[in-house]
Structure formats: structure tokens, C-alpha cells
């Protein structure tokens, strides 16, 4: 589909000491058919590491996490009356970039203090993984959505 993602590791390393950034967390990809997409990535060597759903005002959001050699994909399919063709989504097939943080509350306060364009005005929680996760999102300089994510350990 022409989407290209490049991660600059050296720049992320120098930023990590300031914000508790631990590194890459996952890349979220929107899909029309979750099962077909999961089968495709399984064929490439990815294994399912988590799944679930979230009811939203737009419909039910089905989510699957698949991992291969430390790289995690979040596959997303929205089912419901407000669903439109993924080819018309403004952000393309790649929904967001997610970064793993040590303390999501500290990262949130730092993002606000730096004047980043906040997409979420508070920290959200999802009942995914063993103990859930907490996250918030900002917009990058090109309109890309960047999620700061902390997976709860207990």
C-alpha cells in the first residue's frame, strides 16, 4: 500500500533519559478483515500475543496484537454502523506509532509542559494484556499520531 516507516534509533536514545522513554512499543495497522490480516502475518512468522475488543460510539473495535522477534503489530478492525472504507481513512492504513514509557503519568505531564498538540486530554486505560495498559496520544509535526503507552505490570 506504499506506507513506509523509518525509526531513528540514535535520536530516540538521546531523548530516553529525559522522559522515561523505554523504546518502541508497537505499530498499529487498520484492516478491513482482521482474521485475514492475522493469517497473513502469522504466515510471516508473527504469533498472537493478545486480543480483545472495545465498544466505541462508532462501533466495536476488534484488536489483535502479534509479535515476531520483538516487533509488535496491533491490528485493528472497526465493525459497526459508522464504519467507512479504510481506503478513505485520513491517517492511511497505519493508525499510530506507539512508544513504550516507564511512567505514563510523567510522560503525559512532560508532553503537556512542552506544548505538544494533545489528542487525548487525559490518560486512557484499556483492559488488554494481563493487567491492562494506560496511554495517551499526541500529534507529531506532520500530523502523525504518536501514542505513549505503559503496560501495567500488576
Predicted regions and their residues:
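Conserved short beta-strand elements that form part of the metal-binding/catalytic scaffold
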Residues: 2-11, 49-88, 138-152
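N-terminal beta-strand motif that seeds the catalytic metal site of vicinal oxygen chelate
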Residues: 8-38, 44-50, 94-99, 149-154
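A cross-kingdom feature marking solvent-exposed beta-strand/loop segments within repeated
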Residues: 16, 54, 80-89, 93-95, ...
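Residues that flank catalytic or metal-binding motifs in active/ligand-binding sites
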Residues: 23, 62, 69-71, 93-95, ...
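Core segments of cupin and vicinal oxygen chelate
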Residues: 29-72, 106, 113, 129-131, ...
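Generic preference for hydrophobic/aromatic residues in regular secondary structure cores
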Residues: 73, 106, 121-123, 127, ...
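Short proline/glycine-enriched turn/loop motifs at strand-loop junctions of beta-rich domains
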Residues: 101-105
Amino acid at each position: 500500500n506504499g506506507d513506509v516507516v523509518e525509526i531513528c534509533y540514535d535520536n530516540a536514545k538521546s531523548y530516553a533519559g529525559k522522559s522515561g522513554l523505554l523504546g518502541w512499543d508497537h505499530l498499529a495497522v487498520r484492516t478491513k478483515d482482521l482474521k485475514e490480516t492475522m493469517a497473513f502475518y502469522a504466515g510471516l512468522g508473527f504469533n498472537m500475543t493478545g486480543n480483545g475488543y472495545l465498544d466505541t460510539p462508532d462501533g466495536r473495535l476488534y484488536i489483535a496484537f502479534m509479535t515476531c522477534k520483538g516487533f509488535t503489530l496491533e491490528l485493528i478492525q472497526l465493525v459497526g454502523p459508522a464504519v467507512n472504507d479504510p481506503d478513505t481513512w485520513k491517517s492511511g492504513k497505519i493508525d499510530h506509532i506507539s512508544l513504550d514509557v516507564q511512567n505514563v503519568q510523567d510522560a503525559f505531564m512532560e508532553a503537556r509542559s512542552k506544548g505538544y498538540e494533545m489528542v487525548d486530554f487525559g490518560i486512557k486505560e484499556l483492559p488488554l494484556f494481563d493487567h491492562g495498559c494506560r496511554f495517551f496520544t499526541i500529534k507529531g509535526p506532520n500530523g502523525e499520531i504518536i501514542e505513549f503507552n505503559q503496560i501495567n505490570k500488576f
